[in-house]
Swiss-Prot record:
Principal cellular location given in the protein's record: cytoplasm
HAMAP family associated with the record: His_tRNA_synth
Protein name (record): Histidine--tRNA ligase
GO CC terms of this entry: cytoplasm
Example GO biological process: histidyl-tRNA aminoacylation
Length: 423
């Protein structure tokens, strides 16, 4: 009989397993902490949505919609898509649940997996883990600065310092149409291939986002949006920069920056880390003042960002840093015999109820094997219990780092460990 075939994760989809997963969780939690401190509530979104939401919200001309979405028909023959980004889904939820009818701005944060069919490479996966925030309903440069500062604070809380913030303005409906005509006039004079020409007709900004060296060389002299802003857009951008200066958030103005989604207006930004090579982006976002109305809601503005958790982990590795996760457990129980195991199972339950992380040597490993497991667990303390200790009503409390040990009455061990274990 042939051996049964084994399975592996789909190409480009990573697993997160202990102990490395502790680093991933610590980075994700660190990136969301700054948003919580600024009053951003958690929002949980569906993994898949109506395909039309992303086609309309993200933009038909984007690579995300035209090349990278996981789209399929469900059993009801409805076209659905695994979410490629978070903003469109947030806006749909805000409209559907009338959050925009309450106190503004609506401030939400989220974390979870998103899906894009692209060539897998280091830190670029087909299932990407992302943290994001959105602030909806108020057009205020100070709010733009707050959102950007939250991302900056998240990175710095992890000890990351080799990143930089690049920022620009993409204008709005008062100045973009004239700039669009100017840019198209420039692009149509170039020897572009048919596909690139088509993109230039739909959304010429997409061409400036092209990563191919020959296209980048041809468009090096293209007119820049930053040079054609309306007075109101220029004033908005200048005020954002003034707020960032006041907050001590360093930045570099990059007039050639174009984000990969069509809904961005005015303030647009990206965080990059040169330790990641050509694929240097670790997060970014911007203002999207027409998106809610485009999706059937009120004409309210919004701004947000998405940060790649996987990319941030790689950036920390490039700097030789780790967000030191805590030990997996605080206490490891080593029973010698069935009665001792029953007693330690009860003690472990009591310790956990008091907020102490506890594991136990299951199976019949013997003392030597159990103590090795205790050392590998990262615990600070081992509880060793055998027949003699049971008869005396005590347990051995051993400090694993120093080897020091003492006997403690069984009815006092919970209080004793509360003093010994640091959280």
């Amino acid at each position: 009989m042939s051996k049964a075939s084994t399975f592996s994760a789909p190409k480009g989809i990573p697993d997160y397993v202990p102990p490395q997963s502790a680093e991933f969780v610590a980075v994700r939690d660190g990136l969301t902490r700054a948003a919580r401190l600024a009053g951003y509530g958690h929002i949980e979104l569906p993994i898949f949505e109506d395909t039309g939401l992303f086609a309309r919200g993200v933009g038909e001309s984007t690579d995300v919609v035209s090349k990278e979405m996981y789209t399929f028909a469900d059993r009801g023959d409805r076209s659905v898509t695994l979410r490629p980004e978070g903003t469109a889904g947030v806006m749909r939820a805000v409209i559907e649940h009338s959050l925009d009818r309450g106190q503004l701005p609506v401030k939400v944060s989220y974390a979870g997996p998103f899906f894009r069919y692209e060539r897998p490479q280091a830190g670029r996966y087909r299932q990407l883990q992302q943290v994001g925030v959105e602030a909806i309903g108020i057009d205020d440069p100070a709010l733009d600065a707050e959102v950007i500062a939250i991302a900056d604070a998240g990175f710095r809380s992890l000890g990351l310092d080799g990143f930089r913030l690049e920022i620009t303005s993409l204008g709005d409906d008062t100045c973009r149409p004239q700039y669009r005509e100017l840019l198209q006039e420039f692009l149509f004079a170039l020897p572009l291939d048919e596909d690139t020409r088509r993109r230039a007709e739909i959304n010429p900004l997409r061409v400036l986002d092209d990563k191919r060296p020959d296209v980048r060389e041809m468009t090096a002299g293209a007119p820049l949006m930053l040079d054609h802003l309306s007075e109101s857009c220029k004033a908005h951008f200048d005020e954002v920069l003034a707020h960032l200066d006041a907050l001590g958030v360093p930045y570099v103005v990059n007039p050639r920056m174009v984000r990969g989604l069509d809904y961005y207006t005015k303030t647009t930004f990206e965080f990059v880390h040169d330790g990641l090579g050509a694929q240097s982006g670790i997060g970014g976002g911007g203002r999207y003042d027409g998106l809610m109305e485009q999706l059937g809601g009120q004409p309210l503005s919004g701004i947000g960002f998405g940060i790649g958790v996987d990319r941030t982990v790689l950036a920390l590795e490039a700097e030789g840093k780790s967000v030191a996760p805590p030990a997996r457990v605080d206490v490891f129980c080593v029973p010698m015999g069935a009665e001792a195991k029953a007693a330690l199972v009860k003690i472990a339950h009591q310790l956990r109820a008091n907020g102490i992380r506890v594991d136990l040597a299951y199976g019949n490993r013997g003392v030597k094997g159990s103590m090795k497991a205790a050392d590998r667990s990262g615990a600070a303390v081992a509880l060793v219990l055998g027949e003699r200790e049971l008869e005396e009503g005590v347990v051995v409390v051993k400090q694993l780092a120093t080897g020091e040990q003492e006997t403690v009455p069984l009815d006092q061990v919970v209080d004793k460990l509360g003093d010994l274990v640091e959280h």
